[in-house]
């Protein structure tokens, strides 16, 4: 059994309105430009998600929307638990990960970065609009 996990940090968000709640911050111009390009890169590499778990924040949902030209009818689930998640929270969210296939999670830092570092055993930074593919072969 091979499971593949794509961990993605949302595209660049706007800080234009300082009164806006963090959860409601939208993507900025660069973020709206980058999301479709990341989708193209992911699909060109054959990283085709069969399930997407996405944070409930506006910027993560807009990131997914910006990738929709490649996602087609890929099922997705909005998960409020991904917003401000710790690595333990993210591991719990991933309990629904496909047993044999590719799951994508679109979230935030520091959670996304810590998750990648924890699962890979290596140090990686995750700027906005970064996606990382992790592979797992085995029974758990």
Predicted regions and their residues:
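Active-site-proximal alpha-helix that buttresses catalytic centers in soluble enzyme cores
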Residues: 2-85, 112, 123-126
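Residue-level preference for the first positions of well-ordered beta-strands
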Residues: 5, 100-104, 131
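Short glycine/serine/threonine-biased micro-segments
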Residues: 29, 105, 109, 119
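A generic local structural motif
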Residues: 38-41, 89-92, 118-120
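Mid-chain, well-packed structural core segment of small domains
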Residues: 81-114
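Domain-level recognition of soluble alpha/beta enzyme cores
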Residues: 120-140
């Amino acid at each position: 059994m091979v499971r593949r996990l794509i961990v993605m940090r949302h595209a660049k968000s706007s800080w234009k309105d300082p009164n806006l709640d963090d959860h409601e911050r939208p993507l900025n111009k660069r973020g709206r430009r980058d999301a479709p390009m990341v989708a193209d890169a992911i699909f060109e590499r054959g990283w085709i998600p069969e399930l997407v778990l996405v944070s409930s924040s506006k910027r993560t949902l807009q990131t997914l929307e910006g990738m929709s030209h490649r996602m087609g009818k890929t099922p997705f689930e909005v998960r409020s638990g991904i917003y401000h998640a710790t690595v333990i929270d993210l591991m719990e969210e991933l309990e629904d990960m496909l047993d044999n296939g590719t799951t994508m999670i679109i979230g935030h830092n520091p959670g996304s970065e810590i998750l990648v570092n924890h699962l890979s055993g290596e140090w990686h930074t995750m700027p906005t609009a970064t996606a990382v593919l992790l592979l797992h072969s085995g029974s758990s």
